[in-house]
Regions:
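Signature of Gram-negative chaperone-usher
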Residues: 12-180
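Sec-dependent, cleavable N-terminal signal peptides
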Residues: 1-14
Length: 180
């Protein structure tokens, strides 16, 4: 036995609880990175006596920072393709298959949209643009975060189209709304 030596036993470990909190406010639902583009050009076509189609891709970049999980939709309407007094049919523009999707911020930047839209889709057209119809949507619980979807548009040029030195043009209007 040692004389004059004191030994202390460590005190029992003491715990302290801390509560951490954060308030998460909803953000916006918006087109980002200036898409869709302001001009979409289909390739030039030489008439050959048969019905023809040409395609062009258009990228949409949608940010759903609302945190609601309500989903969203992109709708469209248009005027017919015209050149002077000549026009292509109102049903000339379609999307034949579902768009491709990609998260813009990886690795965990979004919940990819799951669309409820059936394809092919026909872009409504009229001299007075008809009511917009959805071209793509995000079902509830999907489409959160920043993502892009690429649509491949098909333009049908009938065999009886009138050739023109001036391009045929059409005005397309897109809108983004909450809910599918």
């Amino acid at each position: 036995m040692l004389a004059g030596v004191a030994a202390e036993l460590p005190a029992a470990a003491q715990g302290a609880a801390t509560t951490a909190s954060v308030t998460v406010h909803p953000g916006i639902l918006a087109f980002v990175n200036v898409t869709p583009t302001t001009t979409l050009s289909f390739p030039a076509t030489t008439l050959n006596g048969t019905n023809q189609t040409v395609t062009a891709a258009l990228v949409f970049d949608v940010a759903d920072a609302t945190g609601s999980g309500a989903g969203w939709n992109v709708s469209a309407t248009s005027t017919p393709f015209t050149s002077g007094s000549h026009s292509l049919p109102d049903t000339a523009t379609t999307i034949q298959s579902a768009p491709s999707l990609v998260c813009d911020i990886l690795p965990i930047g979004c919940t990819l949209a799951s669309t409820l839209i059936g394809y092919p889709y026909t872009l409504p057209a009229g001299s007075t643009p008809p009511s917009p119809t959805p071209i793509f949507d995000a079902a509830p619980g999907t489409g959160l975060g920043d993502q892009s979807f690429t649509t491949t548009w098909t333009l049908a040029i009938p065999a009886n189209a009138v050739a023109s030195a001036t391009p045929y043009t059409s005005t397309w209007t897109f809108s983004l709304g909450s809910g599918p």
